[in-house]
C-alpha cells in the first residue's frame, strides 16, 4: 500500500466532551515494540506492536473486528507518545532544578 499525507479531522468544531488524556507514562512505555514476519509470507521483518497487548493498556488505540483486537491506530499512538514526552520533560526539568 502507498499513501500520501494522512490527515484526520481535528478541529474543535467537530468535538465535544473534551477532557485531558489520562495515560501514565509507565503504561505507554510498557508497550513492547516487536519485529515479526507475516504468517502469509507477504512481508518479513515488519516492526510494530501486538494489538492484543496494546488493547490491555489503551483500548482506544486498537481497531476491533468482531469484538477482537485486529489492528492498531498508529496515528493516534502519536498523541500518547506526546503525553509521555511532556511527562518526561516535566521530570527532567524538576531534576535540573535540584
Predicted regions and their residues:
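Alpha-helical coiled-coil heptad-register detector
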Residues: 77-80, 87
Amino acid at each position: 500500500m502507498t499513501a500520501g499525507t494522512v490527515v484526520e479531522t481535528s478541529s474543535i468544531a467537530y468535538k465535544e466532551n473534551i477532557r485531558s488524556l489520562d495515560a501514565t507514562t509507565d503504561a505507554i512505555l510498557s508497550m513492547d515494540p516487536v519485529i515479526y514476519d507475516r504468517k502469509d509470507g507477504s512481508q518479513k521483518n515488519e516492526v510494530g506492536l501486538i494489538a492484543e497487548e496494546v488493547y490491555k493498556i489503551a483500548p482506544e488505540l486498537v481497531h476491533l473486528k468482531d469484538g477482537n483486537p485486529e489492528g492498531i491506530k498508529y496515528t493516534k499512538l502519536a498523541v500518547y507518545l506526546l503525553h509521555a514526552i511532556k511527562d518526561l520533560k516535566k521530570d527532567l526539568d524538576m531534576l535540573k532544578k535540584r
